[in-house]
Amino acid sequence: MSVVILVEDDEAVREVLVEALGDAGVRVLDADCPNKALLLVSSTPECMAVVTDIDLRARIDGFAVAERALEMNSDLAIIYISGQREHWLRRTMKSWERSITKPFDPGELVEVLRELESPAERPLA
């Protein structure tokens, strides 16, 4: 079973995603803020991915959360979620990164996680 850390400040969105991922057999550790998310990353070496909203209404955004998480565990896959497409226009995604624009079907997130979980689909950077 995959372990994923979900960082989403909107409680309703977080609950829907936790349920959908759980139904797909993913163990989800959720956080409503960057600090909690980074504590989870540091204490969960078996984590395979971080799913993070970009606009977290905090001092740091989802891109910074991902950067700090990768400093702790360079094997992580990162999935960014946001309602603002312009986030993707100013960023070149690496092989271990994906982006999903809100609103989206939770099944899309499950598919992206499965894709990133497959070593054949995740070439070295």
Language-model features: locations:
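Conserved acidic carboxylate
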Residues: 8
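Two-component/phosphorelay signaling modules centered on CheY-like receiver
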Residues: 11-29
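Acidic, metal-coordinating helix/loop segments flanking the phosphotransfer/catalytic sites
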Residues: 30-49, 89
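Conserved phosphotransfer cores of two-component systems
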Residues: 42-45, 58, 68-75, 91-92
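Conserved phosphotransfer microenvironments
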Residues: 53-67
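As written
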Residues: 91-101
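C-terminal output helix
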Residues: 104-117, 121-124
